[in-house]
A protein has these predicted regions:
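Feature captures the catalytic ectodomains and active-site-proximal regions of enzymes
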Residues: 1-305
Length: 305
């Protein structure tokens, strides 16, 4: 299978839901003007960070990977799992690839990305993390880089999701997205990069001043933003999409054959209309139940290492 891109950069924006469409995001709008954008990508059940980021980076549902916020905060993801992350799959295909995981919420790197994979990593709050990300891109020109920004989820928990404070936080992260995109341009890799932004979940706004939560399956919680730009990305519109499809998209871009579709395992697919040269089957997975529902009412607690 032919490798489509020399570089793939994914920026995850925690708790942003579909509200990119409502925020002041000049960088997002500029970057993805000729790319593919949807505000209706479907999250994973329950709409909680570990379940969602796990699905995106592993390509299976929460009922299969069984990750929770507590688990990823305390246990490393096993090297022997029969459901490896995209980092492990890329490392197997390209032993010398430069891989990076730069996350505000450090349990993603500690509990979803396998150890001993030679993955460059750093953690800090969004604004402090961004210069580290940009330096890494300029110096190392990574084959695959995953970035996680978390301030948006914090704003949702504190003020309610979809409030002016939450939407303002998305606008602030838009500035950081612009810096990361500019770093790829300065590194001379942008023309051969698949550049993506994705949210994991949205959240609720009870309107009582006590802040929002997520974990349920309301429209405000389950529909999220996804955007992609790069050579071969269509601008005509994306069909049905689940956030777990990110894993299949990454493997396709890297030229790595994805596992066969299996409702008890790999359920990540490439959405119709995303790539001009891809026209595969997209299966309905709406009947898959996900993991047991629970509600997250507090912002992440993550040590900075």
């Amino acid at each position: 299978m032919e490798r489509k891109y020399s570089h793939i950069i994914v920026i995850g924006v925690d708790g942003a839901g579909s509200w990119f469409k409502d925020a002041d995001t000049p960088n997002f709008d500029r970057i993805f003007k000729n790319g593919a954008v949807t505000y209706n990508a479907l999250s994973s059940k329950p709409t909680i960070s570990a379940e969602c980021w796990g699905s995106m980076l592993i390509g299976v549902g929460p009922e299969v990977h069984k990750l929770t916020n507590r688990r990823v905060s305390t246990l490393p993801y096993p090297l022997w799992s029969k459901h490896p992350s995209v980092f492990r799959r890329i490392r197997r295909a390209y032993p010398k690839a430069e891989l990076g995981s730069y996350c505000d919420w450090n349990p993603i790197t500690k509990g979803i990305v396998e150890r001993l994979m030679g993955v460059s990593h750093a953690t800090a709050r969004d604004k402090e993390l961004t210069p580290l990300i940009c330096d890494y891109i300029r110096q190392k020109k990574p084959d695959f880089l995953f970035v996680h920004f978390d301030s948006t989820d914090g704003a949702g928990h504190k003020n309610g999701y979809g409030t002016k404070e939450h939407i303002s936080a998305i606008g602030e992260v838009d500035t950081l997205i612009g810096y990361v995109h500019s770093a790829a341009q300065e590194a001379g890799i942008l023309e051969d990069t698949l550049f993506m932004v994705i949210a994991d979940h949205g959240g609720t706004n009870p309107g009582n001043g006590k802040g929002g939560s997520h974990g349920g399956w309301t429209d405000e919680e389950k529909y999220v933003t996804f955007a992609a730009v790069g050579k071969g990305v269509s601008s005509k519109g994306i069909g049905e999409m689940n956030i777990r499809d990110l894993a299949a998209i990454i493997l396709y871009g890297m030229g790595i054959e994805a596992p066969s579709f299996d409702e008890k395992g790999w359920t990540s697919q490439i959405p119709k209309g995303l790539f001009t040269e891809y026209d595969g089957v997209y299966r309905d997975i709406s009947h898959l139940t996900g993991a047991a529902e629970r509600i997250s009412r507090e912002h992440h607690k993550s040590e900075l290492l």
